[in-house]
């Protein structure tokens, strides 16, 4: 996951700053994950993406969320998700009200071992232990 999907995606489609940030990830022993699968997507992962990314032109930032979507619009079965510091997250991008389809976003999940504000994880094992 870390090298092939997380790093591989950043190296393939990331901008210069994102690619250079991978040196820092390696130097500090940080771990990455790849957040594609959503609960209700099943074998159609990547075709069904309910996580949203909204571009804010004023701040030139993206806000990723799955709030207000259906019950199954959260990332699920993300290998290393419980411990990863960085994540490549697939989200359906909207710019100025126009949907642009699924895009990959590099985001911080944790700093100094603590989840970033707005990031949550949960146990998806069944039955729950």
Model-derived regions: residue spans:
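A gly/ser-rich beta-alpha-beta helix-loop segment of oxidoreductase catalytic cores
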Residues: 33-52
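Flexible, small-/acidic-enriched active-site or ligand-binding loops
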Residues: 116-129
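Sensory/regulatory domains in signal-transduction proteins
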Residues: 9, 36, 70-74
